[in-house]
A protein has these predicted regions:
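Generic hydrophobic, amphipathic alpha-helix propensity
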Residues: 26-30, 77-82
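Alpha-helical bundle regulatory/interaction domains
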Residues: 1-42, 46-58, 67-72, 87-112, ...
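A short His-aromatic
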Residues: 64
């Protein structure tokens, strides 16, 4: 019995080490993808771009993002674009842009869905952000 317990403890330690290595690898994948995404200036960024830069499959990227960030790469990219719209709206001077222009600039084509997602993310409509300066 003691030999069995000792063997199980060693196996448990091996499993923990393997899980730690997996989590470290996932962290590197997410960091690589995130650094790349943050460095890209435009809206034309796709999950396949993140896969290429991280040198992993879509499935591996999906698992890594869900494990490390708690969301999918698609959701991450959408939120990144929402934040970039918000930055543009906050930086705008009176009359220099519109919500529609900025939404289109960042690849949002369905304005109702865009407004809903924006409000869910920031607690206000994009038009309110444009009117209000921090």
């Amino acid at each position: 019995l003691e030999t069995l317990l000792a063997t199980l403890r060693v196996a448990d330690g091996f499993e923990s080490t393997r899980n730690d290595r997996t989590r470290q690898a996932q962290s590197v994948i997410v960091k690589t993808a995130e650094d790349y995404a943050m460095a890209q200036p435009g809206d034309r960024l796709y999950v396949t771009d993140l896969c290429k830069v991280a040198r992993v499959s879509e499935r591996t990227l999906e698992y890594a993002f869900k494990e490390i960030m708690g969301l999918s790469p698609v959701t991450y990219l959408s939120r990144l674009r929402l934040h970039r719209v918000r930055q543009a709206l906050l930086a705008a001077t009176h009359g220099s842009t519109t919500v529609t222009t900025e939404a289109l600039n960042w690849g949002f084509w369905h304005f109702g869905e865009f407004s809903r997602a924006y409000k869910e993310c920031f607690g206000e409509l994009p038009s309110e952000t444009l009117r209000r300066k921090p």
